[in-house]
UniProtKB/Swiss-Prot annotation:
The modification Phosphoserine is found at S230. GO terms for molecular function: enzyme activator activity; nucleic acid binding; telomerase inhibitor activity. Pfam families: G-patch. Keywords: Nucleus, Phosphoprotein, Ribosome biogenesis, rRNA processing. Residues 204-221 have a biased composition (Basic and acidic residues). Present with 3850 molecules/cell in log phase SD medium. One of its GO terms (biological process) is maturation of SSU-rRNA. Its main location: nucleus. Involved in rRNA-processing at A0, A1 and A2 sites through its action in U18 and U24 snoRNA 3'-end final trimming. Negative regulator of telomerase through competition for binding to EST2 with TLC1. This is Protein PXR1. It comes from Saccharomyces cerevisiae (strain ATCC 204508 / S288c) (Baker's yeast). The gene is PXR1.
Amino acid sequence: MGLAATRTKQRFGLDPRNTAWSNDTSRFGHQFLEKFGWKPGMGLGLSPMNSNTSHIKVSIKDDNVGLGAKLKRKDKKDEFDNGECAGLDVFQRILGRLNGKESKISEELDTQRKQKIIDGKWGIHFVKGEVLASTWDPKTHKLRNYSNAKKRKREGDDSEDEDDDDKEDKDSDKKKHKKHKKHKKDKKKDKKDKKEHKKHKKEEKRLKKEKRAEKTKETKKTSKLKSSESASNIPDAVNTRLSVRSKWIKQKRAALMDSKALNEIFMITND
């Protein structure tokens, strides 16, 4: 790397493998498992032979095989059933020639090929349903046949049970219908009562509004009468103003008509 390359810093924590958490015995999961009898070093799984004793690790899936295919290959049904190698049948035939069992091995391989073709894409697997458990005889491997008398008795009992059930259903339906009718009547009564109550409230509000309107009209009339009386009692401001002005005009005229008064105003002396 030259000096022009980008610098990348790597920082490692104090515990990169997280051993502090795995060795911590005070956490909830560790104490919870110890209550059920688990101890450090024991595995977790369905069977003690296939249980995991180490931590769960991430594995990279670098093939196009479906999930669980590798585990299925490990489960061998017989010495020929192993799908890990493509040319295993040829190898088995070579071993058969060396051991002198070529015919048995070839027959087994042929049956396996036929089974693969049958169980291929269009293969059909028959699965017995749990419904046939009562009619299936495991000793004779055949279906059980019951007599007609038993069937008739069962049919008669079933018919009686059905009649009783029908009567009970009818009675219950009648009771439900009656309850439904009562419930409807109660609802109608409640609606009527609510409507009457609303009407009564509306009438009370209307009467209150009318009384308020009458009171406001009376107060307006009385206020108008009082204002008219007060206006009649107010003196004429215009007349008083004119009387004062007329007095002032008279005094001014008298001063102008008097020569002595004019001389005093203009500060004229006779000397």
